[in-house]
Amino acid sequence: MLNHLKDAHYDVIGIGKIADIFDNEGLTKSTRIKNNQDGCLKTLEVMKEDFNGLCFVNLVDFDMEYGHRRDPIGYGKAIEDFDVYLGQMKELLTERDILMICADHGNDPTYRGTDHTREKVPLLIYSKAFKETGILPDVFSFATVSSTLADIFSVQKTDLGESIIDQLK
């Protein structure tokens, strides 16, 4: 899907380890980060620019610093810190923008061991243009997000995933 966006001349900006995850495929710009704070600050910088496309961010501290290391206090503090940046991001959104927040897997900092955990992770979707709030049905994979983004940008979909665009109001 990132390649479809790029081929349609959209900006596809990766912040954090997005370039590593996707082997630099489909990105028009990539920025590495040191930590969550750096990632949030770089995201805010991009949001202040005039760009047309997708800004895809991975805040790795939730996983690497607090999840795998089983540090619930640090994890909680990281969520509180992110919440401050989220408020700033929300203020910069326009009526045309859609903000999606999700994790790629569970990593409960209170669970034994150091591996990923298997709980479901939320998908939060926000836009100033939405007129209603609600709860979406369970999303089964990132293919749902990919298909939804393809609909939002009117680009070719991949063969996987069902779009939930019609449920966003």
Task: Identify the residue ranges that each predicted region occupies.
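Feature captures the catalytic ectodomains and active-site-proximal regions of enzymes
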Residues: 1-169
